[in-house]
Amino acid sequence: MGKKLDKKAKAGKSIKKLRKLEGKLWTREYLLKIAEFDGATIAPANGAAARADAMGTLAGEHHKLLTSEKSVELVRSLARETVAGGKIDDPQLLDEIRVLGRDQREASAIPTEEAEAWTRLTCEADAVWHKAKAANDWASFETYVDRIVAQLKHQAELMD
């Protein structure tokens, strides 16, 4: 009986760590979305480069946190606990562990520097897109489309 309680306590600690990790990841995702929304709505157009740099840095922090050895091992250990004896029976928690594990595998295929560069590129492209759309100026946005497509192809290759 003592071993069973000990395993439940260990799972409880791991779940608390998972909740803390999810909170840190969510905070960074939330801040990125606020900056993205700000850039698409009311932020000064000439601030796009600084916003892209800040968002790239924040995206890098998110990527490092998501793919750190500590985070990956936490999710793996929780996944093992779900498979090895059903120590976790909350369906939502099981799905969170599964999705976070998938997110980690995908993110781990891409170096942090490339995740940062992707965020910078898409932030800059968004600012150019809004100007180009209003002016019916496809040519000014075309180079961004080419760069975005090339980067997406590269990311797909890394994930294969």
Ranges and model annotations:
Residues 2-159:
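A well-structured
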